[in-house]
């Protein structure tokens, strides 16, 4: 009996250490009924996050789906890749007004007032920052929407006609590692 229990515990310990190293990854889709951003997938390019960008020009280990793949670790949001770490930041200061961007490299820092943690998936399966939904602003590069965090500014960064969106999480089963342009 004792030997069986010991063997069972040993096999559980091996199974726990053999857990897959791939984080739980997901894509994001903008939800805003009655607006052109509705169902636009999220993209990463030029150090920023967009919705509906026609080409993100990422360097991938397979075919670029055209959409960014994300994961959350310890409240921080990352782009899924195999090379250097690409971490999302938010600048809610008066200067940043909710700017969302990303840095490349383990020691890269964002703007002076940037925040790295506060990301989560809420009970409705939406990505939120500090419990708040995101904002999409039209007329960015290639007619895409730029994505911003809520910082109490309806039209951040001098944009016009911005709308609040829900960023619906879509789990990815077989993520493709990419490096997104800075």
Curated annotation (Swiss-Prot):
GO cellular component: extracellular region
Induction: Expression is highly induced by the V-ATPase inhibitor bafilomycin B1 and by oncanamycin A. The promoter contains two abaA ATTS DNA binding motifs.
Leader peptide range in chain numbering: 1-18
Glycosylation site positions: 57, 107
Biological process annotations from GO: conidiophore development; phialide development; sexual sporulation resulting in formation of a cellular spore; sporocarp development involved in asexual reproduction
UniProt key word Glycoprotein: yes
Primary localization: secreted
Localization per Swiss-Prot or TrEMBL: Secreted; Secreted, Cell wall
Keywords: Cell wall, Glycoprotein, Secreted, Signal, Sporulation
Description of the deletion phenotype: Leads to reduced sporulation and division of phialides instead of forming a single flask-shaped cell.
Family of the protein in this entry: Belongs to the phiA family.
Protein function: Cell wall protein involved in development of asexual structures such as phialide and conidium development, and thus required for spore formation. Plays a role as a general stress protectant produced by the fungus in competition with antagonistic bacteria.
Protein name, entry field: Cell wall protein phiA
Species annotation: Emericella nidulans (strain FGSC A4 / ATCC 38163 / CBS 112.46 / NRRL 194 / M139)
């Amino acid at each position: 009996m004792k030997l069986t229990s010991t063997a069972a515990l040993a096999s559980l310990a091996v199974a726990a250490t053999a857990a897959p190293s791939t984080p739980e990854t997901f894509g994001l889709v903008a939800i805003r009924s009655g607006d052109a951003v509705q169902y636009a997938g999220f993209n990463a390019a030029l150090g920023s996050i967009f919705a509906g960008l026609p080409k993100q020009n990422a360097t991938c280990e397979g075919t670029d789906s055209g959409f960014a793949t994300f994961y959350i670790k310890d409240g921080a949001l990352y782009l899924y890749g195999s090379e250097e770490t690409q971490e999302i930041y938010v600048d809610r200061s008066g200067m940043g007004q909710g700017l969302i961007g990303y840095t490349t490299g383990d020691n890269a820092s964002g703007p002076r007032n940037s925040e790295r943690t506060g990301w989560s998936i809420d009970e409705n399966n939406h990505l939120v920052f500090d419990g708040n939904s995101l904002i999409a602003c039209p007329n960015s590069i290639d007619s895409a929407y730029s994505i911003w965090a809520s910082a109490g500014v309806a039209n951040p960064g001098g944009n016009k006609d911005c709308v609040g969106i829900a960023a619906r999480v879509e789990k990815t089963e077989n993520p493709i590692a990419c490096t997104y342009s800075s």
